[in-house]
Design a protein with these regions (language model features):
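Compositionally biased, intrinsically disordered low-complexity regions enriched in proline and serine
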Residues: 23, 42, 54, 254, ...
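Solvent-exposed, non-transmembrane regions of membrane-associated and secreted proteins
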Residues: 2-250
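Cytoplasmic C-terminal tails of single-pass
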Residues: 276-327
Length: 327
């Protein structure tokens, strides 16, 4: 029992550390899985023959042309940007070369992230990557296209689009589909209500992509839209665009965890000090130290005898009127 009592503070501190670094560890694991998904995607694309590659790309462009003819964009896609799984078989088959729903990936240098892009915006998709909003253009470039990509913000398990609000006009992001990479430069940042989908409309002749996340942080009553227009792509532009791992602990986890750990450490140190003080007192008594002879092992004075009782006892022994007989 005593051993358990000594180990308990250490276990609690370790538990607090795990809670403290849970967001960072979880984000690291998700980013590692995202990196694997990107590498697997690139390998699958490389395995395509030229004929297969062209067939997949042509089908995506044909889909976009049909959307443009139907004036797509003014839809309820933005309002259903969360928990919306696609049931359209044609849509789900496009750009889906591995059958896992991944159509490509996006790299945002400002956020230091490279994330897979999946069909639809179901909760399962948004927990691990970026979702493409159905009824918006597929992100394969071209005139009169407007793709919309949605990502979660503020998840305790992953960053994703948590820092999308840091994007400024002029920032760039890159979308890789099959063997092609498309560069976009931010030109418009707006905040709208979930039902306001006008900002997603296709604009004739323009090649646009809008990144979407919830706002304000942890309130999520509105949508933050970061729009970019197509610019020429040069490979060296993406040199600083690789994702990096860094410690990122939200304050709502950091401050309480640090306070708890500090209290537990202080309590453990006090317990150790008290234990040593008692052991020191016991050692002095056992060694016959005259300075500690009257000190109990726990540091307290021993109980003193009652002087009244002592005197009464002495009087009874002598007895009243009795004298000591001379030798």
């Amino acid at each position: 029992m005593k051993r358990l009592r000594n180990i308990l503070p250490v276990l609690v501190i370790l538990g607090g550390m795990l809670i403290l670094f849970y967001p960072t560890i979880s984000n690291f694991l998700i980013m590692r899985n995202a990196s694997r998904a990107v590498n697997n995607y690139d390998a699958s694309v490389e395995a395509l023959s030229q004929e297969q590659y062209q067939k997949v790309l042509d089908a995506a462009h044909a889909y976009n042309e049909k959307l443009a003819q139907n004036d797509a964009g003014e839809t309820d896609a933005l309002a259903s940007a969360v928990n919306s799984a696609s049931t359209d078989e044609e849509y789900n088959s496009l750009l889906n070369i591995d059958g896992d729903g991944m159509m490509g990936y996006i790299t945002v240098p400002k956020l230091e992230e490279t994330l897979p892009i999946y069909h639809g915006t179901s909760e399962k998709v948004l927990q691990s990557g970026i979702g493409h909003l159905e009824q918006t253009s597929l992100p394969v470039g071209g005139a009169s296209t407007h793709a919309a990509l949605s990502g979660h913000r503020g998840l305790p398990t992953a960053k994703l689009f948590t820092d999308l609000n840091l994007m400024k006009k002029g920032d760039k992001f890159y979308i890789t589909i099959l063997k092609d990479t498309y560069a976009y430069q931010v030109d418009k940042i707006t905040t709208v209500l979930p039902a306001d989908t006008k900002q997603l409309a296709i604009e004739p002749g323009k090649d646009l992509v809008t990144l979407i996340t919830c706002t304000p942080y942890a309130v999520n009553t509105h949508r933050l839209l970061v729009r970019g227009h197509r610019i020429p792509y040069a490979p060296q532009q993406q040199d600083d665009a690789k994702s990096t791992f860094h410690v990122d602990i939200p304050l709502q986890y950091l401050l309480p965890s640090l306070a708890l750990i500090a209290l537990l450490i202080a309590w453990h140190l006090w317990q150790r000090h008290e234990r040593r003080r008692r052991q020191s007192g016991s050692a002095k008594v056992a060694s016959g130290d005259p300075d500690s002879a009257d000190i109990e092992p726990d540091g307290d004075l021993p109980p003193q005898p009652d002087s009244t009782n002592y005197q009464s006892h002495s009087s009874r022994r002598k007895g009243p009127g009795r004298h000591v007989r001379p030798a």
